[in-house]
Amino acid sequence: VAKFGRQQITYRDAPFHRYIGNVLWRQNHQTFDAFSIQNTSLPDTRLSYAFVNKINTIFGDDRDAGIIRNGVIDVEAHLLNAQYSGLPFGKLEGYGYLLEYEDAEATSSKTLGVRLSGAPAINDAWNLVYTAEYARQSDYKSGTMDAQDYYLAELGAKHKGWMAKLSYEVQE
């Protein structure tokens, strides 16, 4: 499936779009002026790519702050995401987000990461719930940011409509 023009781009269900998403819990959703393509021809696999040149933020047309001009961020971004759900115990995801900001080149960054998540059945009533994710964010093109590592670890249980889990999330 290919799309061109203003669109919402998400690679995970809400609220789990940590880096790329539509900020759907706000009254105004974030959209992208982009070309995107998604391929699901391989079994249990979704391959996605998007080239974005504008991010239409949640703030509306009259917002100017930092890199936001009239509610828009000018960017040249390449978004790559691959997901494989054919594992018996969960879903594996790899991603690379390359962002070059036109009005703040020093903040241009690349984020490369991997995520494994699942909810395998323990028995007929209970599921084990887990997520493990690692990403590294560093400078890209004329960016000058220091590299940062992101870690997420979650473990919990799900019973019927209820779920409880412990999470550890840090970016350093």
Question: Residue spans of the language-model regions?
Answer:
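Short Pro/Gly-enriched beta-strand edge/turn motifs at strand-loop
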Residues: 15-19
